[in-house]
């Protein structure tokens, strides 16, 4: 089964895909080069050119893997707990948000009305910069007056998500389409 962007385990699945793809593509490049060398006895042949050009997609896969390698997927226990405590909220998991200055991992995000809350377990993630970046992207997409808060503390994030879930239980759910668009925008700025 394919893991879609925003589902738990996405980062792990992508890392495996990129690593396997890079290894296979470099193996093909080496095989093409060796075949050309064996056939002609020289590296100056057409298959060498094909092998060199074949390095481009292989290198792209390797760069994607190297970019994602330091980051982890959300822990299964935290995923289950969030699903249990906030069933009414729209959620997304395992994101690596990219801005022009930084690459910032975000384990989970919940969306309800005009509020977006996220949890980043990586201590190198700058909470304020990530929140500002998400808010700016949402503003650029005509979602003004959004409140974006990123937490490093899982307990604080979970209590905020529970509070948002309680508010969602009381309010009518006419904003689901809007929340799905907000979630899609956040996923679009993620690797």
Predicted feature residues:
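Surface-exposed interaction regions that form or flank ligand-binding interfaces
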Residues: 1-92, 132, 141-146, 153-191
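Active-site metal-binding core of divalent-cation-utilizing nuclease and nuclease-like domains
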Residues: 87-106
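Short acidic/polar capping segments at secondary-structure boundaries
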Residues: 96-97, 123-124, 155
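Active-site beta-strand-loop-beta-strand hairpin of nuclease catalytic cores
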Residues: 106-117
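Conserved, surface-exposed functional patches that form binding/active-site neighborhoods
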Residues: 114, 120, 133
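Canonical phosphoinositide-binding patch of PH/PH-like domains
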Residues: 117-125, 146
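Short, non-transmembrane amphipathic alpha-helical segments
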Residues: 123-141
């Amino acid at each position: 089964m394919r893991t879609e962007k925003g589902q738990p385990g996405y980062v792990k699945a992508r890392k495996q895909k990129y690593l396997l793809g890079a290894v296979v593509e470099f193996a093909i490049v080496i095989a093409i080069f060796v075949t050309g060398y064996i056939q002609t006895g020289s590296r100056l042949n057409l298959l060498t050119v094909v092998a060199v050009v074949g390095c481009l997609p292989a290198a792209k896969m390797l760069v994607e893997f190297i970019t994602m390698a330091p980051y982890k997927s959300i822990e299964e226990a935290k995923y289950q707990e969030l699903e249990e405590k906030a069933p009414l909220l729209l959620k997304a998991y395992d994101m690596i948000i990219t801005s022009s200055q930084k690459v910032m991992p975000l384990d989970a995000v919940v969306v309800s009305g005009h509020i977006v809350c996220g949890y980043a377990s990586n201590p190198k993630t700058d909470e304020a910069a990530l929140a500002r970046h998400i808010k700016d992207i949402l503003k650029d997409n005509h979602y003004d007056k959004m409140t974006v808060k990123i937490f490093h503390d899982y307990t604080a994030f979970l209590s905020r998500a529970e509070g948002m879930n309680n508010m969602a239980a009381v309010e009518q759910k006419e904003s689901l389409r809007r929340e799905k668009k907000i979630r899609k925008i956040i996923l679009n700025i993620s690797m």
